[in-house]
Amino acid sequence: MRFSIVVAAYNVERYIGECLESLKSQSFGDFECIVVNDCSQDGTLDAIDRAIAGDGRFTVLTLERNSGLSAARNAGMAAAAGEFIMFLDGDDYYAPEALERLDARITADNLDMLYFGAASFYESRKLRREHYENQEVRESVGGVHCGPDMYVLMERTKAFRPSACLYTVRKALLDTCGLRFLDGILHEDVLFQMQLIPHPQRVAFLNEPLYQRRMREGSIMTTRPTMRNVHGLAVTAQRMQEWLAAHAGEYSREFCEAYAWRTSDTREVAARYLREIDEADVAAYRKGLSVEELAAFDLHVLGLWRSMGHVYDEYETSHAYRIGHALIAIPQKIRKLVELPQAKPGE
C-alpha cells in the first residue's frame, strides 16, 4: 500500500464529509485512510460513518476521551500500514489529483519525503481580512536534497511551512527515528517537523496547491490565543534549543543558523501572543511551573515579551500613531518584531 492518510477529527460534523469525499474521489486509489475520532461531542462520528460506508479503504478509531491532536495523530500512525504517511485535518481536503501527483514525484526521484503546497480558503470576508495567509505564493526549490539542506533552502526562500499536513514521509523513517507528536501541547506540528528534518536523505518540494486549507471560526488558527498556545510554543522552542545544542557539531553552519533562527522565531511568536492574554492568566500559568520551567519561561518568553512591550508602548504614544497613520508609518524596529524576518542562512 502506497499511502496511509491519518485524519484527525474533533467536532467537525459540518466538514468531515467533504474531507473524506475528497479522498474517495482521488485519481490514485492505492491508499488507506485512518480516521481518528477524538471523542467528538457532536455528530462527527455519524457523519464519518455515512461518508465511508462500503469503502474498505477507510478505518475508524474512536478515542475514549478527548485527548488532543497529538494523541489522535499518534493513534493513527500506530495503525498505519502504508509506505508513506500523510496527515489531513478533518475540516480540510485534498485536490482530486493530490495522491497521483505525489506518487509520481516520489517514484521519479526515489524520495524519502516530499513537501507540497496548499491553498487557503475562507468561510467569510471577516476571516479573510483578519487571518489572510498567502499559501499559494511560495518560491519553488528544485532538485533533490537531504533533509537539512532542503530545510536551509526552504527557509532562505521563505517556502518553509511548519505544518504536518504539507508533506508526506516514509513511515519506516518515522518508526526508525521513533518520532511521535508530543502529547499535551498545541502547535505540535512545529516540534515534530523540526525533529524530523535531520533524518531523510532524499527530499523534494512539489510546489502545487494539493492541500485545501479551510479558515473557519473556532479553529486553533482563528481563535484568540491563550496560555495553551504560549505553552506549546515555549516548550517547542526549548526542545529545539536543547537539540541544537547537543547536535550542532554534526551539521553545517548554514543549517545551524537556520535552525537557530526558527527556534528564536518560535519564541517571538509566543511572546507576541502574551500581549493578547490577561495578566492574571499569565500569573496563574507561571505559578504552576517548576523552578526550572519558570526560569526558562521568564528568560526566553516573558523577558522577550517585556522588551517587545516597550517598543509597542513607544509606538502607541508616537505622533504617527495618534494621527491615524498606523499602517503607513510603522517604525522599522517594530517591523522587525512583528514581521517574520527572512532567514538568510550562510549569508
Protein language model regions, located:
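Acidic helix N-cap motif at the loop->helix transition within catalytic regions
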Residues: G17, F31, D42-A51, R57, ...
